[in-house]
Each structure stands twice: as C-alpha cells, then as structure tokens.
Amino acid sequence: MKWTEVKVETASEAVEAISNIMMEAGASGVAIEDALDIENFESDLYGEILDKEQFTHIKEGAIVMAYFPETTFLTEILPFMKENILRLPEYGLSIGKNEMTISEVAESDWATAWKKYYHPVRVTRFLTIVPSWEAYHAQDEAEKIITLDPGMAFGTGTHPTTRLTLQALETVLRGGETVLDVGTGSGVLSIASRYLGAKDVYAYDLDEVAVAAAKENMDLNPIAADVHVSANDLLKGIDHSADVIVANILADIIVLMIEDAWRLLKQDGTFIISGIIEDKKAMVLEALTKVGFVVDQLFNQGDWYAIILKKPEEE
C-alpha cells in the first residue's frame, strides 16, 4: 500500500492548528518539523537530554506533513484543508509561506518516517515527554515521565504554548486539586496534572478524534488511568466545580468560555490559559478582568503567552 504525503510549509505558531485541520480531514498521522524545536532545545533550562543531531535542521518556520491512504479522495479534502488554513489569520495566527506540496510515500517508509521527528524532551523542571516507542529512564528521582503516542499529532509538548502551560501547571499545582482541562488534544496537560498531584482531572475536547487520542495516551500512563475524558463544547453544560481550569486553545475561543470558567472555579481558584499570541493578549486580558479575574503571573516564549489568573475570594 502506498500513502500520500501532504506537506505544508508554514509558521511555527500555526503548527498545532494545521495538524488538527489535517487530522479532521482524515490523515492517518501527522509529523512536524519545526525550527523552534532547535531553539527550545538550545535554550532549555532543564538540562540537555537529546543529541541535537536528532533534529532535522530547518532554519526558520515549520513543516507539517500529513499522511493519507492512497485511496483517499484528495480532490475533496484538499480544498477543505486549504480553506481552513487560510482562515487561521482570523485567529491571529501567521501561516507563513503556506506552500502545499503532495507526493507518494511507500508503506515501508511511512511506517517509520514520521517517528524520527519525535524524541524525549525535558519540558519543565520535573516533566519529560517521551514517545511511546522510545526507551528512556528518569535521570533523577524528581523527574516524571509522560509517555505519549504523537501519531495523532495533538500537541507533543514541544510547541511553546504547550510548554508554557506545563510550566504554569507546575507552578500552580500543590496536590489534591480538581482540574478541568479544556481542549485536551493529546491529553498531555491532564497527564501532567496527575503527575503534579491533582486528585481529580476532567479532560474535554470537541473533536472525537482528539478524545480517542487522549484516551489512548491515558492508557500509556497508569497514573492517568482515572482521568475522565469526554467530548464536550468547551465548558457548556459542565457542573464540576474546580480548583484549576486549564485551556491551551486559541485566544478567541478562550474568550467564549470565560463566564463558564468563572462559574465553575471555586473561590481563590486558578484559571490557566495559553495559546495567546502577543497581538491578542490585550483583548483576552480585558475580557478576563471584566468578569473579575485577576492576573497572577505571565509566562512567555517569544510572542506566545500563558497567563495564570485567580478568582478572588469574596469579601
């Protein structure tokens, strides 16, 4: 069997959104080559884990590669992908060159080709993300290993938005909390929350493919076996009160869930948001403070921001 590779040259900030578009179009897998991965590695404060030669050296931007069975009707799905990618700037995401190329890949090449883009990465002081096929052992007692199968490509921990969110969770969680993870994708934030001591974790995603991928990744991490994963539109209809709500999604989508987040957070609860590009930060903060949230901390990597907010206790 042969596979069709659809390759999109884009900007780093659009990688996760384009990956999701490709999966929605029916891709069997997605691989990402991102110049930011090299930058993240070289500036990593948490110790070198990898040999830099494991990364493919592209100088700028990113390449997203999706793989479809040769029987796929590309004439139907290509317009869908192109149209949705062209809409990303409406959400504040640069799509860079946005050049799409198509080629054939043999079955033997497809089986292993995409795996070369994923290796163990220390993403925070305590958390290391390891692909499911890699043999890796903790370097010290404090290191926690999150095992992921990135074949479904819903965030693998190396994108700035994911790393910033993980750092924020590590800052906030002290043990025993109830956490709501909105737009869970791969489930990495929910798994991290359990490793960082959260007692009850609920993970939601509108995309059934993401829900399935998250459940598979929970199975790879026994500590997360009791995470509740389900399909849901943001926090609509949810009635679980929470100590922490975390959302690594587009800024415009975060604004839509602010009132529900306020409703569900306990007094002195914490709202962690990420996926905020510089151009959208002021708009999001204005909407949050209007409801009553108070900014506690900001994290940034380049133009990307994660923000920790508090719901003040009533006087």
Swiss-Prot record:
Stretch forming the signal peptide: none
Annotated CDD domains: AdoMet_MTases (cd02440)
Record family assignment: Belongs to the methyltransferase superfamily. PrmA family.
Entry EC number(s): 2.1.1.-
Record keywords, A-Z: Cytoplasm, Methyltransferase, S-adenosyl-L-methionine, Transferase
Gene source species: Enterococcus faecalis (strain ATCC 700802 / V583)
Subcellular location: Cytoplasm
Catalytic activity reported: L-lysyl-[protein] + 3 S-adenosyl-L-methionine = N(6),N(6),N(6)-trimethyl-L-lysyl-[protein] + 3 S-adenosyl-L-homocysteine + 3 H(+)
Residues engaged in binding S-adenosyl-L-methionine: T162, G183, D205, N248
GO biological process: methylation
GO cellular component, as recorded: cytoplasm
Protein name listed in UniProt: Ribosomal protein L11 methyltransferase
GO molecular function (one): protein-lysine N-methyltransferase activity
Protein function: Methylates ribosomal protein L11.
